[in-house]
């Protein structure tokens, strides 16, 4: 039996939700739950900060005059930014703010190619009456990409490259409960709890994950079908070869047909 009902329930915020799939055949609740969870956490496309540059800073171990946080803390803050990038190429975002005060994602200058979903996220705290200037490079991707795998030749001198977590899903958990269908009590109900970073809704996240799985299974199904057709086909190389028709063969064939006709005519007269 295939599931006949999928229900999406809202959570405490628009980016926390629950998906309920029922009824599932015995054992398939865990199978579906674990598979969807892995895809949700690893394979959805998203965007993240890939590198940044602060005026007057040469590397991640430098001290920043007039800023409370060190570079390591700023890196951690940048990893928490939730954003959408609408182009394939990396986008450069800029910040220019005079202290004292708090620098947040809302201070990033507007860019038509980027949408900031976490405008209240803190980036740095300015403690002096100085101007803080920063460039943030954001890009699109899937899953997790460490800084070591990025080509540093693509960045200017003084740019600090960081690890990037592109997935828009922050957390996924699932549970399986028994449910009744008629007199049968061992069917299962799958409950998925999903939290995103604000750039995608839980419903869209589940739909994209299911589509990714369907695309992969379609390739497997297509490959299995092609193999089946190949087994049913007859190899032409195994067929007996036709002998070439020569003049002698054609003449013998005509004589045989003529003899048959004469014999039939004689029998008819009798």
Set out the residue ranges of the language-model regions.
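Protein-protein interaction/assembly regions in multi-subunit complexes
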Residues: 1-270
């Amino acid at each position: 039996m295939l599931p006949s009902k999928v229900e999406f329930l809202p959570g405490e915020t628009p980016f926390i939700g629950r998906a309920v799939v029922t009824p599932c055949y015995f054992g398939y609740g865990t199978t579906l739950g674990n598979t969807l969870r892995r895809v949700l956490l690893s394979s959805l496309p998203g965007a993240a900060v890939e590198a940044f540059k602060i005026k007057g800073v040469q590397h991640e171990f430098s001290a920043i005059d007039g800023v409370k946080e060190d570079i390591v803390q700023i890196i951690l803050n940048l990893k928490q930014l939730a954003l959408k990038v609408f182009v394939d190429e990396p986008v450069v975002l800029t910040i220019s703010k005079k202290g004292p005060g708090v620098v947040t994602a809302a201070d990033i200058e507007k860019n038509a190619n980027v949408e900031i979903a976490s405008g209240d996220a803190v980036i740095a705290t300015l403690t002096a009456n100085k101007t803080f200037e920063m460039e943030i490079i954001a890009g699109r991707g899937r899953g997790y990409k460490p800084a070591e795998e990025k080509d540093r030749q693509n960045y200017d001198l003084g740019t600090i490259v960081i690890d990037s977590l592109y997935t828009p899903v922050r957390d996924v958990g699932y549970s399986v409960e028994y449910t009744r269908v008629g007199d049968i009590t061992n069917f299962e109900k799958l409950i998925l709890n999903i939290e995103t970073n604000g750039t995608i809704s839980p419903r869209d996240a589940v739909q994209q994950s299911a589509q990714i799985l369907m695309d992969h299974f379609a390739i497997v199904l297509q490959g299995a079908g092609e193999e089946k057709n190949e087994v049913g086909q007859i190899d032409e190389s195994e067929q007996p070869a036709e002998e070439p028709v020569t003049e002698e063969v054609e003449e013998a064939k005509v004589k045989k047909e003529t003899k048959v006709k004469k014999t039939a005519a004689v029998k008819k007269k009798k």
